[in-house]
Amino acid sequence: MIASLPMYARPENRAAHSALWALIRDGLRARALPAPDGLDFDTPHMQGWARPDLVLGQICNLPYRAQFQGRVTRIGCFDYGLPDCPPGQYYSQFVVRRDDPAASATDCAEAGYVFAYNEGLSQSGWGAPQAWAAAQGLALRPGPKTGAHVASLQAVAEGRADWAATDAITLRMAQRWQSALTDQLRIIGRTAPSPGMTLITRQGQPPQPYAAAITEALAQLPAEIAQILGICGFHSLPQSAYDIALPSPPQPA
């Protein structure tokens, strides 16, 4: 069996994630639910989400909507306390180089700026930015596919792309632990919110005892651990929150 919290995992918060998992694990076991001793930090995301022995996973809402809805049980979302954002949701922030003359994300799209994205199955890196552009009657000009949000930030800083959109929580962590990179960048806008990284378990499991164990664990989590993780709550979102049209895949020039 496997448990993983991969979406905001970094070396700097690995011990904090493990401490949170220990509390969740004990809560699950107290409810007669099997749970592994420790988190898995090595299994690729897609493989972990598809495991028939998945105890707890964390998935971006776009791959959930596109490929895993009906294949896993949705539990809820951690709340990371983003300003001007509903609990349990998140948004992307657009960035350019600090010395770029663009005043807004609209300026970037209208000028045909080259857009770095982590992958086409990322809500924050591609899905939400594309929806933002479509709502403005604009289009993105896809550039390098970087494979990771931080790599997209690096692509912009190094001039391999003109702008990018990154998960606001990932950006907040990069500002904390990679300030030499983020100091080269400037935020110029944001997308609409959508469901945050969603906690899931294997298909056929009732979500309620998992949600109860997670809520209980957060109540017991030491404040200094919660501060490292940036987690301030847990929310179970309705299915309607996930009723979002799927984006078209990027079509690089």
Per-region residue spans from a language model:
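N-terminal hydrophobic or amphipathic helices and topogenic motifs
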Residues: 1-73, 77-80, 84-89, 223-253
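A ligand-binding cleft/hinge motif common to bilobed small-molecule-binding domains
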Residues: 55, 59-69, 157, 162-183
